[in-house]
């Protein structure tokens, strides 16, 4: 007898592997690869920041009831402000470091008052990035043509704060419109300025050239800088390049004009008003090839290593709102379970983060996991800088919420790579883990988190891309292990979806297949949890290319008022997992890998996938996916003990089926919508051998005694 109980078989109807050419599913009941999980911890939902007015539109009683019908119970709160280079005023009430002028470094109020319903991000006026990963409406102050504005690096990366014994040089990168001849630079320094810095050019053919290196110009190394606005003659002969970098290693620690009081943060880091590059004219002036404009579409592109979280009351971004903390917990979206909460980090202060956690603790909200920042790899900063901030924040915040652990880094993608950092080449996450180890701080990483949107191109053969992503999740797990992520901590997909872009495939049957597979495969690989992104009912959109059509990543297609209307395949996938495959609730289940044999010509390319769940009620749940767009498949389910003989499973039982008979998407541009949308079909299986028919693009769950 296996640890999961005795399999029910059909006496005399034994089917040996290889005895027939038809496909068949084989479940090994005591497979050593089985993974323990609890449904109310493993499969959840993600709520994020939104555009103006969308939080109110989402959190209505009708929408909340519709979302909870998914059966996905735990919740993670996503922090869009971290993608938009904004500081999060998690409580609109709070204090400024320069209160008289309503500016400086913000700390939200941690005293209890009226419930917080909405919160906002605040743009950072000392920004040095031309683009961001959120609304992307702001611009870099390095090439905006205004000498009264400036970029400043994050003072919390200064040695005066970190005291970690590590060098954290800061940098700015300029990407010209095309390769240009460069022999001079004008760096218009603000306060504090760099006393030691190096002006460099990129030797690679392009930014993705693995052989590229940052090379100092012949006269580009400055060891006794004194600020000002000097014209630097970098070389006797111009160097042709498209990418330039100013690497700053020592600062003046001088106070900027107009600073209030004697705040150490005003002395820490580096500040630059404007940069220009080009060649020296005969009259000694600079023929500047940089485009200076206060617009992210018109200025020369720049990117920086970090940003000062200093801002003003007038910088509130009314178009980027976050759900209020109280509102999230009061909504019951988390079903009373612990919610994974974030704090700002890359663009925030530890003081504000600490106040947030004190507020959560005072309210008694259930929180066990706290994610520090979001998508730092997508900001293309130095992973060693992120690691230093991570450790500093984690140690500062530890113990405020009793029993809570800190984690991250919420990678933009599992296969994160560094960008133009030849001193730290390869895996961004690998460099992050290595930096934690150098500090003796790997124990501060309480869980590993990343986001997963595997289909980048929504045009072409979607089904081939589905097959490819099956391998991708396994490759990510292998990569984490190779990077040194401890297996003793939870590995969590804190957001997943079909694609980061909206298009037709997100609303067609393959979207349900992918959602189901991500959830079960991640658990089967030893992952701890996966959270679905896209809980807000949505209207179809196209964010990719004309060939991608219109669709939405959502549980429901919305009506014109943003309320849940027609169910989408992602809802069916969630319900099949939470209400059919498993027993709802907190009881322990075992995830078993299923083996599909004999696919051959009947199912070319491995289009059939299967997993099984040993349930606490003594039953066996089996999930089958058919990722063929055209072929239906009928096959038996076999069970065996390890080393034993595979035998055909026997009914009675239950079966749920979801395919084209239940759902079809009608493409009509922005007016696209389901032409058919009904729940998965449910039927009872009679006694006798279990044979299952999978429709094209179909999901099937079978539950039998084991």
Positions of PLM-derived features:
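Extended extracellular/luminal ectodomain segments enriched in beta-structured repeat modules
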Residues: 167-169, 177-184, 240-242, 617-619, ...
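Trp- and acidic/polar-enriched beta-sheet ligand-binding modules for extracellular glycan
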Residues: 168, 191-282
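Disordered, acidic Ser/Thr/Pro-rich linker "stalks" and the adjacent N-terminal cap
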Residues: 89-178, 190-193, 278-287, 295
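Aromatic/acidic polysaccharide-binding cleft in carbohydrate-active enzymes
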Residues: 493, 497-608, 616
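Carbohydrate-binding surface patches
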Residues: 601-651, 655-660, 697-703
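N-terminal substrate-binding region of glycoside hydrolase catalytic domains
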Residues: 32-123, 276-325, 333-348, 352-355, ...
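Noncatalytic carbohydrate-binding groove/subsite architecture in carbohydrate-active enzymes
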Residues: 350, 356, 383-521, 525
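Acidic, Ser/Thr/Pro-rich beta/coil linker or hinge segments at domain junctions
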Residues: 644-695
């Amino acid at each position: 007898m296996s640890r999961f109980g005795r399999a029910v078989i059909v006496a005399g109807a034994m089917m040996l592997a290889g005895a027939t050419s038809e496909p068949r599913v084989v479940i090994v009941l005591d497979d050593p690869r089985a993974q323990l999980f609890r449904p109310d911890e493993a499969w959840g939902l993600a709520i994020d920041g939104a555009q103006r007015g969308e939080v109110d539109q989402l959190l209505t009683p009708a929408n909340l009831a519709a979302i909870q019908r998914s059966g996905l119970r735990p919740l993670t709160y996503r922090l869009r402000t971290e993608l938009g280079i904004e500081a999060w005023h998690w409580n609109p009430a709070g204090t400024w470091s320069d209160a008289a002028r309503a500016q400086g470094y913000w700390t939200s109020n941690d005293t209890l008052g009226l419930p917080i319903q909405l919160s906002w991000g605040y743009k950072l006026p000392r920004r040095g990035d031309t683009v961001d990963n959120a609304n992307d409406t702001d611009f870099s102050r390095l090439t905006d043509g205004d000498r009264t504005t400036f970029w400043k690096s994050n003072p919390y990366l200064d040695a005066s704060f970190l005291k970690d014994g590590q060098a954290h040089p800061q940098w700015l990168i300029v990407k010209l419109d095309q390769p240009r001849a460069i022999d001079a630079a004008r760096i218009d320094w603000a306060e504090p300025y760099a006393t030691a810095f190096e002006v460099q050019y990129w030797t690679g053919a392009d930014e993705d050239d693995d052989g590229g290196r940052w090379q100092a110009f012949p006269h580009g190394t400055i060891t006794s800088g004194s600020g000002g606005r000097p014209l630097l003659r970098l070389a006797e002969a111009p160097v042709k390049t498209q990418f330039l970098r100013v690497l700053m290693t020592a600062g003046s620690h001088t106070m900027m004009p107009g600073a209030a009081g004697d705040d150490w943060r005003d002395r820490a880091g580096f500040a630059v008003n404007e940069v220009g590059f080009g060649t020296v004219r005969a009259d000694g002036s600079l023929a500047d090839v940089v485009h200076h404009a206060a617009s992210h579409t018109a200025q020369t592109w720049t990117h920086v290593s970090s940003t000062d979280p200093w801002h003003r009351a007038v910088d509130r971004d009314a178009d980027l709102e976050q759900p209020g903390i109280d509102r999230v917990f009061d909504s019951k979206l988390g079903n009373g379970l612990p919610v994974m909460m974030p704090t700002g980090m890359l663009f925030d202060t530890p003081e504000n983060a600490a106040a947030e956690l004190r507020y959560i603790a005072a309210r008694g909200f259930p929180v066990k996991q706290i994610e520090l920042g979001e998508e730092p790899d997508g900001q293309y900063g130095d992973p060693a800088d992120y690691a230093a901030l991570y450790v500093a924040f984690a140690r500062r915040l530890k113990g405020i919420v009793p029993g809570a652990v800190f984690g991250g880094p919420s990678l933009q993608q599992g296969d994160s790579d560094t960008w133009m950092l030849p001193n730290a080449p390869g895996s961004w996450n690998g460099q992050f883990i290595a930096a934690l180890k150098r500090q003796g701080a790997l124990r501060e990483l309480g869980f590993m988190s990343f986001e997963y949107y595997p289909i980048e191109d929504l045009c072409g053969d979607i089904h081939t891309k589905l097959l490819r992503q099956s391998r991708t999740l396994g490759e990510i797990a292998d990569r984490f292990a190779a990077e040194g992520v401890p297996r003793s901590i939870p590995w969590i997909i804190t957001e997943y979806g079909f694609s980061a872009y909206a298009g037709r495939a997100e609303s067609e049957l393959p979207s349900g297949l992918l959602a189901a597979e991500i959830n079960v495969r991640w658990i089967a690989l030893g992952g701890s949890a996966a959270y679905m992104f896209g809980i807000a009912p949505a209207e179809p959109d196209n964010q990719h290319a004309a060939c991608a059509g219109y669709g939405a990543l959502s549980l429901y297609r919305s009506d014109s008022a943003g309320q849940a209307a027609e169910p989408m395949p992602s809802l069916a996938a969630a319900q099949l997992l939470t209400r059919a495959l498993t027993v709802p609730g907190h009881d322990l289940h075992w995830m078993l890998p299923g083996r599909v044999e004999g696919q051959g010509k009947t199912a070319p390319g491995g289009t059939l996938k299967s997993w099984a769940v040993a349930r606490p009620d003594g039953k066996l749940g089996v999930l089958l996916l058919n990722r063929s767009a055209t072929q239906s498949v009928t096959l038996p389910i076999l069970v065996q003990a390890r080393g034993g003989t595979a035998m055909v499973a026997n009914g009675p039982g239950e079966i749920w089926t979801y395919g084209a008979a239940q759902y079809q998407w009608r493409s009509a541009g922005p007016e696209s919508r389901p032409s058919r949308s009904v729940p998965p079909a449910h039927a009872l299986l009679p006694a006798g051998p279990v044979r299952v028919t999978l429709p094209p693009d179909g999901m099937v769950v079978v539950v039998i005694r084991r």
